Curated annotation (Swiss-Prot):
Protein family per UniProt: Belongs to the universal ribosomal protein uS4 family.
Record organism: Ureaplasma urealyticum serovar 10 (strain ATCC 33699 / Western)
Record domain S4 RNA-binding: where: 94-157
Assigned keywords, A-Z: Ribonucleoprotein, Ribosomal protein, RNA-binding, rRNA-binding
Oligomer status and interactors: Part of the 30S ribosomal subunit. Contacts protein S5. The interaction surface between S4 and S5 is involved in control of translational fidelity.
SMART domains hit by this protein: Ribosomal_S4 (SM01390), S4 (SM00363)
Any one of the GO CC terms: small ribosomal subunit
Keyword set includes Oxidoreductase: no
Single GO MF descriptor: structural constituent of ribosome
One Pfam family this sequence matches: S4
Protein task: One of the primary rRNA binding proteins, it binds directly to 16S rRNA where it nucleates assembly of the body of the 30S subunit.
GO biological process: ribosomal small subunit biogenesis; translation
Protein name as catalogued: Small ribosomal subunit protein uS4
Length: 202
């Protein structure tokens, strides 16, 4: 399965979940706040399998992953001590593109991914252009000095997440101070269903 590049608004309405994480897709001013298609406004009771699939898709589309990437991260979470469901979310949040977004350096996860892809991001002072790179606690994330004048960056007003320390606001330097707690992560995802899905396959 390749990475989804279509309309975030349509996908959010289909999943009943804000992929932009601000519920903008469901604002009353929009033409439709329900799923696309002829029967998009009808409630359908999902089977256990269907619920597992929906919850997996929520995380895949939220973090911009394909199935192969998601499986790899699931295996990483599986190898860590602790609660698997929380481990999975923490691994997803440890991706470099996710941390660039969480640090408030980009307005969306897609924009954060582009910043990493185009070599605007430093990890511990070294250029890293792989969005999927996993960042360890204590590492610093920064934007290149010449990138700070980009309108995308200058116009981003997002505040950093509580688990990220803003070392230098003007120079866009942040530090992953700790792994996030469950209460700091998307509430509208039931990651237990995702674990059930992969336990069945692996």
């Amino acid at each position: 399965m390749s990475r989804y590049t279509g309309s975030i608004y349509k996908k959010s309405r289909r999943l009943g979940f804000s992929l932009l994480e601000n519920n903008k897709e469901f604002n009353s001013g929009k033409k439709r706040t329900y799923g696309p298609g002829q029967h998009g406004n009808k409630k359908v009771k999902l089977s256990n399998y269907g619920q597992q699939l929906v919850e997996k898709q929520k995380l895949m589309f939220l973090y911009g992953l394909n199935d192969r990437q998601f499986r790899r991260l699931y295996r990483v979470a599986l190898g860590r001590p602790g609660v698997l469901t929380l481990n999975l979310l923490q691994v997803l949040e440890s991706r470099l593109d996710s941390l660039v977004y969480r640090a408030g350096f980009a307005p969306t996860r897609r924009a954060a991914r582009q910043l990493v892809n185009h070599s605007h991001v430093l990890v511990n002072g070294k250029k890293v252009n792989i969005p999927s790179a996993l960042v360890e606690v204590g590492s610093t994330i920064a934007l290149k000095e010449k990138s700070l004048e980009m309108p995308l960056i200058k116009n981003t007003l997002n505040k950093p997440a509580d688990f990220i320390e803003l070392v230098d606001k003007d120079k866009k330097v942040a530090k992953l101070s700790r792994l996030p707690e469950r209460s700091e992560l998307p509430a509208d995802v039931n990651e237990a269903y995702v674990v059930e899905w992969y336990n069945r396959l692996m």
